[in-house]
């Protein structure tokens, strides 16, 4: 090999090596940043779990993590941005859990229901009961979702883009169950989306009475009231009482055979 060719090859190899070093360093920085971001999210979730959504502030996080407030702002532009990310993670956890429930129960419904009408009605009852029980199993996630739906200020476009796709996905899964019940004649014709919104809002509202259950545990038994509300809603949507009784019995059996709210690892275990 002539000296010129050898020199050119050496320069090329050196350039490749330099690029590799730069890429490795960039990858390491990105991993470190992702790990740090996850650390902040876990800290935020702990605050929500211990003291509630209203206690989540950047200063509280900085105190808990022994870091400067400004450091947190390099990862999240505002408290709303941090809260939006927490809500996205929370909603996705609930959604994944619901998908696991559907994957477990759908084959059983097809095999054990008397017909497609009973299967669709049982699936609807299971889905609404799932929503009730997430308040117990995924308390923090449910509180974060409630904070999204009850906030007084308008969600900023950047936060909306961060959170709403996950919320719409969960909403769509619930609406599909309502629509299937309509399509099979299990409940009367109507707007499936409006019914799902009504159900979610009503269940969430009833569950709020748990906050005063210590005054009268029987009167303000939020979960029991919410489960009764599920039956009232489905009956109000036109379900035949005998059909509803059979579908509820099948839903009861399936709930006993596996978790009604399957476990999905959360950010606190990441």
For each feature predicted by the language model, list its residue ranges.
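Helix-turn-helix
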Residues: 39, 47-81, 85
């Amino acid at each position: 090999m002539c000296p010129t060719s050898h020199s050119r090859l050496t320069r090329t190899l050196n350039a490749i090596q330099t690029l590799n070093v730069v890429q490795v360093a960039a990858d390491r920085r990105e991993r470190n940043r992702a790990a740090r971001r996850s650390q902040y999210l876990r800290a935020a979730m702990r605050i929500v779990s211990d003291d509630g959504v209203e206690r989540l502030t950047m200063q509280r996080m900085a105190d808990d993590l022994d870091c400067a407030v400004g450091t947190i702002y390099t990862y999240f532009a505002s408290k709303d941005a941090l809260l939006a990310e927490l809500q996205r993670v929370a909603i996705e956890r609930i959604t994944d859990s619901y998908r696991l429930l559907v994957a477990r129960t759908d084959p059983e419904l097809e095999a054990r229901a008397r017909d497609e009408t009973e299967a669709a009605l049982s699936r609807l009852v299971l889905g609404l009961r799932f929503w009730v029980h997430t308040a117990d199993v995924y308390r923090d996630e449910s509180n974060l979702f409630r904070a999204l739906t009850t906030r007084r200020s308008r969600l900023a476009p950047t936060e909306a883009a961060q959170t709403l796709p996950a919320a719409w996905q969960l909403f769509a899964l619930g609406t599909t169950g309502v629509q299937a019940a309509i399509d099979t004649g299990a409940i009367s014709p109507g707007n499936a989306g409006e019914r799902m919104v009504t159900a979610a809002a009503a269940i969430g509202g009833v569950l709020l009475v748990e906050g005063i259950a210590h005054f009268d545990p029987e009167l303000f038994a939020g979960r029991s009231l919410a489960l009764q509300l599920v039956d009232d809603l489905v009956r109000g949507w036109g379900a035949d009482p005998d059909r509803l009784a059979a579908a509820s019995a099948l839903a009861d059996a399936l709930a006993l055979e596996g978790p009604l709210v399957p476990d999905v690892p959360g950010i606190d275990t990441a």
